[in-house]
């Protein structure tokens, strides 16, 4: 698909595995995303994967393909800016910090704490997840690349720098 749409430079992937990545390996899916990005000069924005329903593990590692080194991986925060209860953590290969950024993905048990999306019947659905945070970052990245004319590397670096701030702690 990427090869047939060379004018599209930013691709959103709001999907991911329920399984955790292995500590010292890159998944085949992530390796393929990295290859495509290099070969076609595109960027993938990947949802940081959610902790599956029913799993009580608090510090669950991200799932594939969020272990892609060159993709912009997005976690979710609630509307107060706190990490959402379902988000997962990196690192990848023990030292690459993933996810790269976080954005509003909704959280909580009441509808006002969630994201509002359109349904097929023209109604509204109240949802939460990293899959709803990632498209917002895709839009920002596409703006920097397509409108501002920045390279994908510079655009990604600007978004990460703006998100991390100077007081970043990687505990």
List each model region and its residues.
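Flexible, small-residue-rich helix->loop connector segments that border functional cores
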Residues: 2-5, 144-150
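Conserved structured core elements
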Residues: 23-30, 59, 68, 95, ...
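Extracellular S/T/G-rich loop segment that most often corresponds to the catalytic His/Ser-adjacent loop
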Residues: 61-142
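Acidic, glycine-rich active-site loops and adjacent beta-strand->loop/helix elements
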Residues: 17, 48-52, 77-79, 107, ...
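Substrate-binding/access-modulating region of protease and related hydrolase catalytic domains
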Residues: 1-64, 124-128, 132-133
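C-terminal subdomain of the subtilisin-like protease fold in secreted/lumenal serine endopeptidases
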Residues: 146-171
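Acidic-histidine catalytic/liganding microenvironments
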Residues: 5, 68, 162
């Amino acid at each position: 698909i990427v090869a047939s749409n060379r004018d599209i430079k930013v691709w959103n992937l709001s999907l991911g595995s329920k399984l955790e990545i292995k500590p010292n390996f890159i998944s085949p899916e992530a390796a393929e995303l990295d290859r495509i990005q290099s070969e076609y000069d595109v960027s993938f924005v990947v949802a940081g994967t959610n902790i599956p329903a029913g799993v009580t593990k608090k510090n669950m590692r991200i799932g594939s393909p969020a272990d892609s080194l060159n993709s912009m991986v997005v976690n979710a925060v609630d509307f107060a800016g706190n990490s959402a209860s379902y988000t997962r953590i990196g690192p990848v290969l023990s030292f690459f910090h993933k996810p790269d950024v976080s954005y509003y993905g909704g959280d909580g048990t009441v509808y006002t704490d969630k994201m509002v999306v359109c349904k097929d019947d023209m109604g509204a659905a109240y949802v939460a997840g990293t899959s709803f945070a990632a498209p917002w970052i895709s839009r920002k990245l596409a703006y920097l690349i397509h409108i501002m004319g920045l390279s994908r590397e510079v655009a990604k670096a600007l978004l990460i720098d703006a998100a991390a701030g100077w007081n970043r702690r990687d505990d």
